[in-house]
Amino acid sequence: MAQYEHNSEKFGYLNLETLDGVQTALKALGFDPGKVDGKDGPNTQNAVRQFQAHATIKIDGIVGPATRSALMNELDQAQRAAGTSSA
């Protein structure tokens, strides 16, 4: 599995190295990026900023390594809270 991939019963397979994977993760975590289309539009950037504020990381609207890592951590926490395991 690549560095920014998540696979679990709750969320399924998510590749956070792709923008549509990031959008799907944001949506699953309650941060609405709008349509999951792989495009870095204003809705996606806004959702990324909201997530970055939530994760207390640099708020810049850019999906870099810190944001991807924070998304992975948040997905893992939500997975554990749901009582199912990551694959």
Model-derived regions, located:
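Generic hydrophobic/packing signal
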Residues: 16-19, 47, 56
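Short beta->alpha linker loops
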Residues: 39, 43, 63-66
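Short alpha-helical segments in extracytoplasmic peptidoglycan/chitin-binding modules
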Residues: 23-26, 37, 47-52, 60
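Extracellular LysM carbohydrate-binding repeats and other cell-envelope/extracellular binding modules
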Residues: 50-86
